[in-house]
């Protein structure tokens, strides 16, 4: 056993001291000689040798098998000899295999080198093609270049030769040379312009002279103004006699004498405010003056109506007695009767939109009602969600907190309604108008809430103290609703309008997009699970308007609902959010959703923009898109899932998470452009 292993083990041959190579070096020499031999040998001959060797091996194997099957003792030497021959053939096959591998390696190397050369030539070709394209563009620019003289409108060639002197036109040269012809035409243009410049100077001097004459005549006319004023003062009796049109203000004051006390106070105070502070405020009196003059006595009390009805029962007439229902209808009409005259206030905003308020006085109820008419300065686009923004019955609701104009402000009216079967004044508001509390204040009326007050006194001081504030609130309400109407038209098309002044509040690239903006009902808002906190805090009322929005990015969908107070933008909108991405997330189960709500609900003052802050809503929605980007890009990626990130991080964040709640950096820092925690 040990002798066989010693025979099989390859002896270690080292280089001798006289410089002869050992066995290892001989093997290396053989390897390299085989590489050189590949270049000399023919692969086809090697292939034929391979086939012959295989055939010889098959023949030797079959002969050995035949000899062994015979079992003759004399055949042992022959079998051993054939084994030796087979080993020689195996050695030949191994050598052929080595040569084939060397050829394969060389073929691969040659292919790789050829591929590299082809790639280099291809790259060089692309560079040359790019240079050719660049040169072609430059050539095109040069060919399309227009000289400055081409923009000058020169006279025609016929006029040039007919008007220009021969020293400039040079017909013997320019008629055959287009270049010289153009130069000569330009010289003639220059000569003409010099002449026109001289004429211009002469005209300016003449203009100055005429202006001086005009100033002298103006001074003369100004000296006539005092004389004309005295003549106008002396002609006042004649104007009254002839009823000249410019005396209409005097007529209006005459008509004001027939106004009831609240409307008269309103007219006087509004006229005074118009003259002193707002000359665009137009105050007018409308209605039937003759009917107003006929009202020489106050309306009869309800007790008198009862006595009259008793007297009618005692009369013996042949006409049919009216039914109880008809009597109640007549009493209701009498109770809700308006004064024949009314006062209209026309408020004009800077952009040209007008808000016309018509004030009526209900004589038996002793209250003022208002009807509204809106005239925008521009054509409004159709927006479904903006349907109620400019509704005359809703636009002035809650101008002051809690004043929706649906109930009467006079406590005495409740007892009057009970007698004639009127359940609520809201059933007649469309016909009579809204009895807002601020309307009573503008008319000098004040009704205490603790006890009925059948008698009223119109106070001028009360009206004057509230006039300016109310007028400003009315204008602000109209402007805010018009601004919201334009914003809603853009939001319904998925576009968030952001002004230039507010673009610094957001990064240049916001990927999340608004895909839905609709109006929803108050009941639908209450049914949403993620609006519970807002409802419990009393921030959602029936007088508010409610909208839903959807912001998407990839598979993430951010649903939100908005509470829009009538007093927008003094009272900011309130947002409630719910994110549908890998489950449903709201402020109740994800602290970062609560932080996103705080960014738009608590820090809204950063988004108001330039006064009066009508862009607050759109800026809040744009911030929500930005916050959704930060939320998704800072979310931890699942490393077990192969492939690229769905939301690759593109925002610069100083710190991704902070605190035990693991809040994300939602605050945008301008102009540095990074996000941080608050």
Swiss-Prot record:
GO terms for biological process: cell differentiation; mRNA export from nucleus; mRNA processing; RNA splicing. Residues 1-37, 294-329 are annotated as: Disordered. A motif (Nuclear localization signal) lies at residues 7-10. It is found in: Nucleus; Nucleus speckle; Cytoplasm. InterPro entries: THO_Thoc5. Disulfide bonds: none annotated. Its main location: nucleus. Residues 14-37 have a biased composition (Basic and acidic residues). Keywords: Cytoplasm, Differentiation, mRNA processing, mRNA splicing, mRNA transport, Nucleus, RNA-binding, Transport. Component of the THO subcomplex, which is composed of thoc1, thoc2, thoc3, thoc5, thoc6 and thoc7. Component of the transcription/export (TREX) complex at least composed of alyref/thoc4, ddx39b, sarnp/cip29, chtop and the THO subcomplex. Interacts with thoc7. Component of the THO subcomplex of the TREX complex which is thought to couple mRNA transcription, processing and nuclear export, and which specifically associates with spliced mRNA and not with unspliced pre-mRNA. Plays a key structural role in the oligomerization of the THO-ddx39b complex. Belongs to the THOC5 family. This is THO complex subunit 5 homolog B.
